[in-house]
Amino acid sequence: MSHTPKSAGSSHAPVNSQTALVIGAIGVVFGDIGTSPLYTLKEAFSPHYGLTPDHDTVLGILSLVFWALMLVVTLKYVTAIMRADNDGEGGIMALTALAQRTLPGGSRSMYVVGILGIFGASLFFGDGVITPAISVLSAVEGLEVAAPKLEPFVVPITLVVLSMLFLAQRFGTERVGKAFGPITLLWFFALGAIGVYNMARAPEVLHALNPWWGVRFFAQHNWHAVFVLGAVVLAVTGGEALYADMGHFGAKAIRRSWQFVVLPMLTLTYLGQGALVLRNPAAVSNPFYEAVPEWALYPMIVLATAATVIASQALITGAYSVASQAMQLGYIPRMHIRHTSHSTIGQIYVPAVNWCLLALVAVAVIGFGDSASLATAYGVSVTGTMLITTVLMIIYARANPRVPAPLLWLFALVFLAVDCAFFYANIIKFLDGAWFPLLLGLILFTLMRTWRRGRKLLHDEIRKDGIKLDTFLPGLMLAPPVRVPGTAVFLTADPMVVPHALMHNLKHNKVLHERNVFLTVETLQVPYAAAGKRLKIDAIGDEFYRVHVRFGFMETPDVPLALMRSCDQGGIYFDPMDTTYFASRETIVASANRGMPIWRDKLFALMHRNAAPATGFFRIPGNRLVELGAQVEI
């Protein structure tokens, strides 16, 4: 995903800029929800739910789909949740930070909100595995309609398409990304045209817009109707992307895209599929492709495959973005991040995330085999994330004096009921496939919690055994070691304690540099650090300095650049060719008698050993770096 400056999404942006943002948003934000028509109605009438495609049932399902789009996407996300932005950024991590700000620091409620945010992000990655698999598989399954003899080749073709997609990530998407918007726009207009084509033959399908048919469906099917919501929710998968990508395109462009293009075209295509089923109930086997005129079938398969690849690309890029934020906020180990664009901020490639996603997507395609089986696994991660988002929004809005209490209660009652119903409808499919994304989410949640807890234990252990800087320096200056020319920068997590690297340097080299800097890097709970608050320099005597550098969680930390700019703010001048960076690299020793169970200690030690060095993460040049080892028991 490319990062668009916030001003681009403002009401004062030029018309051409707004149009470009709208088209860009259609290509990136709405790819997931735009490919849902490939499988939603097909899944609703699958044998799994035992529904007969008669007149009342078809209108009932269509009514539920339409009003799910209106309630969940239009009212919840577009109208309400997109108002909660963290300096223009959206997404579950940003909302977690907003909700935590309304709570007392260090309180149990703040801790619980953090846990909710981590679990929501974990479910997002589970969604990131299922979405490419089900989307591309559904598109390629059109070959079964066009040429049934090609059925055995559907899975291999899907794997080839997905492999090419993931292999191409390392080259970036800046060039081809410009075509995403127009292609997806063409896709939506094709959906609308096919919908109108079929509606003209059964205009009575328009009755489904009346919510009475949805209510009637519940009255006729009782609790079984709740079970069917597991298929209806497939129509709103991708709704979370509207909020997550708000910082890239601006709320205005996303709202316009939804109101004037995406919602109308989705409504037309679902009604068109319903009209076809009313005329030909046998078409429920694959209502999307059965609704396409025979002459347009192969072009539609190609367009659908392109649309699903674009939807998958948007989600993959989103996974990189969330991973980068999680690294910055200290929830997962540092990984190598490669910037794939010289001109566009936010175009990144994270190899570890890419290859993990490819392996898991391939497992999903091979293990489930078809889109119908994958659909049973799909909804639980999406609905879990939607439910957590609602809870976080309620916590945040509760502290906002501009939100009237009756309105907040209404929001809470309506959307907690809707989200809980959708989540329940999917969680009861646990043995049918819902276990897969939940297992992925649980594994990632465990990794994130272990890393977070392990880092705290490591920090506490270093601080416990450390020497206070304020008492160490006066003693050192009583018998000062030999001073050598240049500047030494010691990276430390705790600015009040003597860094291990300094102790080792004195012990083995017996020298001090002319100027010594104790550098602490902090990631803020906002996307971008304010220019005036990025750097703080305290002189503590005898050419020793305590420097605090702050970055937002959406920024790429560049420590040398931040230090070089210090003189612009009246600070000291750093000559990059005269500066040596010192860092300690801890070796973790697991202990059964400390803070975590031994298996989590060993897991943390493994993660720590394989994490990318902080020096590379902070853009510190290798030829100016000295790393010194230290063994720490946790």
From Swiss-Prot:
It is a multi-pass membrane protein. The chain crosses the membrane at residues 21-41, 58-78, 110-130, 147-167, 179-199, 223-243, 258-278, 296-316, 348-368, 377-397, 403-423, 427-447. InterPro entries: K+_transporter, K_trans_C, K_trans_N, Kup. It catalyses: K(+)(in) + H(+)(in) = K(+)(out) + H(+)(out). The keyword Nucleotide-binding does not apply. The keyword Repeat does not apply. GO terms for cellular component: plasma membrane. It is found in: Cell inner membrane. Keywords: Cell inner membrane, Cell membrane, Ion transport, Membrane, Potassium, Potassium transport, Symport, Transmembrane, Transmembrane helix, Transport. Coiled coil: none annotated. Its main location: membrane. It holds the Pfam family K_trans_C. One of its GO terms (molecular function) is symporter activity. Belongs to the HAK/KUP transporter (TC 2.A.72) family. PANTHER family: LOW AFFINITY POTASSIUM TRANSPORT SYSTEM PROTEIN KUP, OSMOTIC STRESS POTASSIUM TRANSPORTER. Transport of potassium into the cell. Likely operates as a K(+):H(+) symporter. This is Probable potassium transport system protein Kup. It comes from Xanthomonas axonopodis pv. citri (strain 306). The lineage of its organism: Bacteria, Pseudomonadati, Pseudomonadota, Gammaproteobacteria, Lysobacterales. The gene is kup.
